[in-house]
Amino acid sequence: AHPDDEILWFSSILADAGKIILCFEDVPGNRHWSEGRRASTSQYPLPQLVNIALSEADIFHAIDWTTPVPSAEGLEIPGTSSGGRVYADNFRRLVDRLGDELDGCSNVFTHAPWGEYGNAEHIQVFRAVMAAAESSSCRVWVPGYVSNATVALLTACEVELGRDVITLPTNQALARDIATLYKANNCWTWYKDYQWPAQESFRVVSTEPVDEGAIWPVNHISIRPPAPPRQSPGLTRRLARRFRRLVNRKETGHGR
């Protein structure tokens, strides 16, 4: 979906992929990420990159991951914000463009229907790939990454997953090289100290009901919520002294 997702969730297959398709580029309200992504794709070390370059929908913080509601476009976006309208429009654009890009493909590896760590645009890309691949014989595979925010969505997933599972060693050298490019261009979106797992697994999506399950090793990510900003004790004391001085001035008639 986004620049850097390809090395976070698909590093093991990246170098051998016939196409590496990035869906989104500009980020509303974040000029540094937008410019950095354009610079990174122009400097990308692998030649098979395809950049659809849609603008993201501004909905990252709109989802309550304790009660996500699936929709045809991915997830329902609460409220009537412009981000929700962009999200719906992006789905239609993705289906059209991916239909062209996936023509003739035998296998496509894309985001999971629960969005890995929890990203509504990842889920949207999965839905768009499934819609685009509907009229072809292309097999769709999803990565085995899940977080504490999305494990419930994985458990309740209505998408049929087949028995075929592929487990491969991650390509950590390539992943780190491309991560360095994103970091140099100030558009790396993941944890700075992230350590890739030794392996990652992919499971095929079935278009028919599946009676039997499969053993599927998944990588679990613990999402760390951002810590609230903290004021230093010195700043707190200075603000308290200033407030007391203002109160004293009011009481003696010197204030405005």
Annotated model-derived regions:
Residues 1-104, 131-138:
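Active-site rim/loop-helix segments in enzyme catalytic domains that contact anionic ligands
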Residues 77-256:
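Metal-dependent de-N-acetylase/amidase catalytic core
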